[in-house]
Amino acid sequence: MPEPVAEPALNGLRLNLRIVSIVMFNFASYLTIGLPLAVLPGYVHDVMGFSAFWAGLVISLQYFATLLSRPHAGRYADLLGPKKIVVFGLCGCFLSGLGYLTAGLTASLPVISLLLLCLGRVILGIGQSFAGTGSTLWGVGVVGSLHIGRVISWNGIVTYGAMAMGAPLGVVFYHWGGLQALALIIMGVALVAILLAIPRPTVKASKGKPLPFRAVLGRVWLYGMALALASAGFGVIATFITLFYDAKGWDGAAFALTLFSCAFVGTRLLFPNGINRIGGLNVAMICFSVEIIGLLLVGVATMPWMAKIGVLLAGAGFSLVFPALGVVAVKAVPQQNQGAALATYTVFMDLSLGVTGPLAGLVMSWAGVPVIYLAAAGLVAIALLLTWRLKKRPPEHVPEAASSS
């Protein structure tokens, strides 16, 4: 975790602008993810002629690479400082675009082209984990650890914004100039972000001996488990709400997803100080309660308006879960280990979203689509009970390393 810069207290618009000036680098990294997201599956399957398995694998490789590299991103951010990690991650985003470009240029050699696409996706996954983790820690270093919840919230907002913008823009660029044009746009976005990041003032890396990964995991895993359980609700809505609407014979699944996203972003914008005012665990428990009600409404919905209200509540409830628990998880370790703690904590969400789809698909094929929303509500209820137990647990003293004093 970087050492915060000592300067007058920030608040209001000035604070938000300072945070946005850093998390915009995470926006750039997620824009490079969103731009090819709606293009590559069809390109691999329809243009290159590979099976749906390979089309899915090309997309999934990025997520696996992000999952595996995220703990390393946090540890290197603690050791080297977050700015270097952000620039490194953005370089990975640039190289992923180069991979797409060379894949397009070697389209006459399908196997080589596919390998280059896969390589680009792996590099993108590594780049995103470094840019995302680094930008959060850089933002905290700039505005101070008091505002860590707000930094995490803004990171989530720019993530959703970049993905929402990137997918339709990517389709437009692809229809305009093919895969090569899309690749050049991706490289351009990453290059501009790198050039903007390099002259920015750095923040010092924290001094002190880092804890081993096992020790960091031991401090944050309960918060990560609560996050993973709550993420199941997000996973079943994002993945299966279209099938749910089809099974009911309703229209409007896309609008339901829009409602979820609006509730998610709107809640973060409306309650920026909630975590500081009433505490991360209290906010998390309130959020779990709202998310449970929303998921239950979706599961028992007999009319489209019931499902839409449920999706809206689920989005609002899930919105602050990550920053609320993240603030507490990060503060459970010494300052020089907080980058590793944040990255390790985030892995639980990555894992949850990775396994929710297949497991929910099995449950759906056995018991029907509505049941997966009721099951997800049950998992969030377990997260609520776990967080309640964590709140009742006596606070632990977190010693700072002697060398950091």
Swiss-Prot record:
List the GO cellular component terms. Answer: plasma membrane
**What main location does UniProt list?**
membrane
Keywords linked to the UniProt accession: Cell inner membrane, Cell membrane, Membrane, Transmembrane, Transmembrane helix, Transport
Q: What GO molecular function annotation could you give as one example from this UniProt entry?
A: transmembrane transporter activity
Show which residues constitute the signal peptide.
none
Q: A single Pfam family, by name?
A: MFS_1
| Subcellular location(s) per record | Cell inner membrane
Q: Where are the transmembrane segments?
A: 19-39, 47-67, 85-105, 107-127, 156-176, 178-198, 224-244, 252-272, 283-303, 309-329, 344-364, 366-386
Membrane topology note: Multi-pass membrane protein
UniProt xrefs under PANTHER family: MAJOR FACILITATOR SUPERFAMILY MFS_1 (PTHR23517:SF13), RESISTANCE PROTEIN MDTM, PUTATIVE-RELATED-RELATED (PTHR23517)
NCBIfam families from the UniProt entry: PRK05122.1 (NF003477)
Q: Which family does it belong to?
A: Belongs to the major facilitator superfamily. YhhS family.
The protein, known as: Uncharacterized MFS-type transporter YhhS
Tell me the organism. Shigella flexneri
